[in-house]
């Protein structure tokens, strides 16, 4: 029973830790236009996009390396 509880807990932690990687890529309405990276599930990779500087979400990384690090379980 304890093993089952630990297994379920581990699965929930993993899925919660990468859930932001599954959020849509949101450029935002502002016009700062900075290069950012986001995980794109349809291609299972991090891709570059232009972020406007406001109203984005947590699927928004300053570098490809950061994106790949945080979303590596989905690659």
UniProtKB/Swiss-Prot annotation:
Protein name stated in the entry: Kunitz-type serine protease inhibitor As-fr-19
GO terms for cellular component: extracellular region
Similarity annotation: Belongs to the venom Kunitz-type family.
InterPro entries recorded: Kunitz_BPTI, Kunitz_BPTI_sf, Prtase_inh_Kunz-CS, TFPI/VKTCI-like
S-S pairs: 21-71, 30-54, 46-67
Domain named BPTI/Kunitz inhibitor: residues: 21-71
Protein purpose: May exert inhibitory effects on serine proteases and on potassium and/or calcium channels and then participate in the long-term non-lethal paralysis on the prey.
Leader peptide range in chain numbering: 1-17
Tissues showing expression: Expressed by the venom gland.
Record localization: Secreted
């Amino acid at each position: 029973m304890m093993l089952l509880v630990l297994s379920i807990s581990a699965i929930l932690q993993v899925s919660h830790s990468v859930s932001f990687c599954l959020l849509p890529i949101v450029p935002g309405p502002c016009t700062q236009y900075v290069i950012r990276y986001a995980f794109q599930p349809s291609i299972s990779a991090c891709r570059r996009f232009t972020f406007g500087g406001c109203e984005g979400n947590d699927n928004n990384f300053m570098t490809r390396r950061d994106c790949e690090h945080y979303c590596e379980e989905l690659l």
